[in-house]
């Protein structure tokens, strides 16, 4: 599930940036 993992990481990064 590499694609899914990458997508998840991308979403997490976006959320972290928004929360930062």
Curated annotation (Swiss-Prot):
Expression (tissue specificity): Expressed by the venom gland.
This enzyme's EC code(s): 3.4.21.-
Modification(s) after translation: Glycosylated.
Residues in the signal sequence: none
Sequence similarity: Belongs to the peptidase S1 family. Snake venom subfamily.
Function: Snake venom serine protease that selectively cleaves the heavy chain of protein C (PROC). This activation is thrombomodulin-independent.
Name of the protein: Protein C activator
């Amino acid at each position: 599930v590499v694609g899914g993992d990458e997508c998840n990481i991308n979403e997490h990064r976006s959320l972290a940036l928004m929360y930062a």
